[in-house]
């Protein structure tokens, strides 16, 4: 079993902000940095309604006070319900918690983006329920990044090709230097980019992984991912990039 805690204490400001984001007439939008267009947001004050959870062995998942808390004893993926299309950027802040809890391992700040499933009609990742075990995602076509994996000893980027037991890894996307790992209890700014052939992950404004993809994945879902770890996430935003 997993426990989901929904925050019911919505402030007047967060309610009005949410209505502004969801009730804009067609053709109107909110602008982000550099004339980027805000498509989606989650300030984690109104529960987990925008997320689908696949948890291997339960856990505690709650959204309250502006923070999504992911406390999991095993593998878990939280899929953002809205499908995304390139050119797009996904922004959020994330922390690996070290406060003495049973899952406070400081490990595995991971994610999927532009994910589709080769087994599903139309490729919809939400059409198939998975156990949360990592091997269950092999048949996705997606970009995947794992920061501080293997108990905070590796950081890797992969382009999944939709085949079981086939997760290609290029040498330049297999990092092991200390500066590419995770510091405990520190907020990191993550930006994921899918803009035509340009695929990127930036951490605190600095490119960490880059791929010039000649056959880019141009639509799909975003998923937060970790395993036996305790993460906190805040300020989740999705922008359409100019182009």
Predicted segments with their positions:
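N-terminal secretory signal peptides
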Residues: 1-10, 19-25
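C-terminal segment of N-terminal export signals and the immediately downstream linker at the start
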Residues: 9-10, 26-36
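C-terminal alpha-helix/helix-terminus motif
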Residues: 19, 23, 27, 235-240
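Extracellular glycan-recognition regions
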Residues: 32-243
């Amino acid at each position: 079993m997993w426990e989901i805690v929904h925050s019911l204490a919505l402030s007047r400001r967060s309610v009005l902000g949410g209505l502004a984001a969801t009730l804009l007439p067609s053709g109107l939008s909110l602008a982000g940095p550099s004339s980027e267009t805000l498509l989606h947001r989650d300030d984690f004050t109104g529960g987990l309604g925008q997320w689908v959870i696949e948890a291997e062995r339960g856990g505690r998942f709650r959204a309250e006070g502006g923070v999504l808390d992911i406390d999991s004893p095993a593998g878990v993926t939280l899929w953002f319900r809205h499908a995304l299309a390139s050119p797009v950027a996904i922004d959020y802040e994330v922390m690996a918690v070290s406060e003495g809890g049973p899952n406070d391992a400081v490990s595995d700040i991971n994610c999927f983006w532009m994910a589709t499933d080769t087994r599903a009609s139309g490729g919809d990742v939400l059409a198939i329920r998975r156990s949360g075990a990592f091997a269950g995602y092999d048949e996705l076509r997606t970009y995947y990044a794992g920061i501080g994996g293997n108990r905070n000893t590796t950081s890797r980027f992969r382009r999944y090709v939709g085949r079981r037991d086939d997760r290609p890894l290029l040498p330049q996307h297999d990092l092991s230097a200390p500066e590419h790992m995770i510091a405990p209890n520190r907020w990191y700014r993550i930006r994921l980019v899918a803009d035509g052939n340009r695929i990127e992950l930036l951490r605190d404004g600095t490119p960490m992984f880059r791929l010039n993809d000649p056959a880019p994945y141009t639509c799909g879902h975003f998923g937060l991912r970790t395993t036996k770890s305790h993460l906190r996430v805040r300020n989740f935003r999705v922008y359409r990039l100019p182009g």
